[in-house]
Amino acid sequence: MSYSTQQDILDFVEDNNVKFVRFAFCDIFGTQKNIAVLANDLPKALEDGVCFDGSSIAGFMKVEESDLVLRPDLSTVTILPWRPTEGRVMQFFCDVEKPDGQPFGGNCRGFLRSVNRKFKKLGITCNVGAECEFYLFENDDRGRPTRIPIDFGGYFDMAPLDAGENLRRDICLTMEQMGMSPQHSHHESGNGQNEIDCHHAGPLKTADNVMMFKQIVRAIATRSGIHASFLPKPLPDQAGSGLHINLSLYMDGRNLFEGDIAPDSIAGSFMAGVLAHSRELTVFTNPLPNSYQRFGCDEAPRYVSWSRQNRSQLVRIPQVKGDNCRMELRSPDPACNPYLAIGLVLAAGLDGIENRMVLSAPVNKNLFDPSMAEGLGLETLPASLEEAVQAAEESEFLRRVLPEQLASRYFAEELKRCEALKHASDPVEYERTHYFNAI
């Protein structure tokens, strides 16, 4: 669907028996929220926006200044096909504004949009792709999630070892119905672990797609009596789940990641910026205490380094051709806010370009074996959420690029997570129990 005017939207609502319209957005951690507007009230909502209590959303507003307004992005309209066909449900992604129309510092979509505009001013087009992994678990007789994966399959296995094949098919077909472009679907390394990848798109479109993808997976899994979890490390003895971010840059129609990458080229400087700021970005790409159980094993990096092909590196350049040429950042996990994660990775790369950073030499060693890193002098990613918060709070780069309100409230909420974990009698079980159903 592609609609640009309010009248286009109203005509579509009438022609398609739409009765409910969701105005969707997310808090600073990427948890999706929404308010449903009945179709009869949609004209006013499109004209004036929808007012809501920002003090009730994590990291948004104080009680004494709580009013905020949702402004729908008309280009994101879509029907939710798993909802009833009679009295259909439609959804927009929204930006968040202050009541006077001024920008709101916690509007994560707005932050990503502003970073992308800076690239456009340089004549650079950014394409972003996301590889999202997730687990599928059985529910008990009362419909509550268990820790029992739906199968004992492994990487690229087929049925009957792969019990999620039909569910992945339903997810991909639903994505296509909603205008998304799934590319690959397969069983991952862990028991009950799955991956579905989307074709690359613009940064904002990809972040919207990640949010919608998680919504689709949960809805279809629930309909099938299965629990879907995007927790980075739901099972201690199985692979962690990542959200690998793939990025390519185009200038004058040419993919800057195609061919050899000179250390001082635009692509080289972009990569250098991402590597230089990777430690301070980690609190945004890996926002849970549980996230840090994934690093250093199961194809999740620990060291700040890059290479071609090598999956033990933080950044790698896949050996592909043409428009598929790209860099892949392997640290992010699916608990992150995709607007902030993608926006900050792009901002780090832009900082590298603007300051003409020079890309370091590649590290062609298997860094999943810690002994291979000895003597190389490599930085490591933070080993805990608390360490990640400290790195971010000390970052001059983040003070420059992030709205102060968003940064300070994000860090404060993350420190609360650290304190809650410290006071838990069983920290590992606390975080799995506390986040297992929510992420």
Predicted regions and their residues:
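Glycine-rich, acidic/polar active-site loops that bind/position phosphate-bearing ligands
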Residues: 1-439
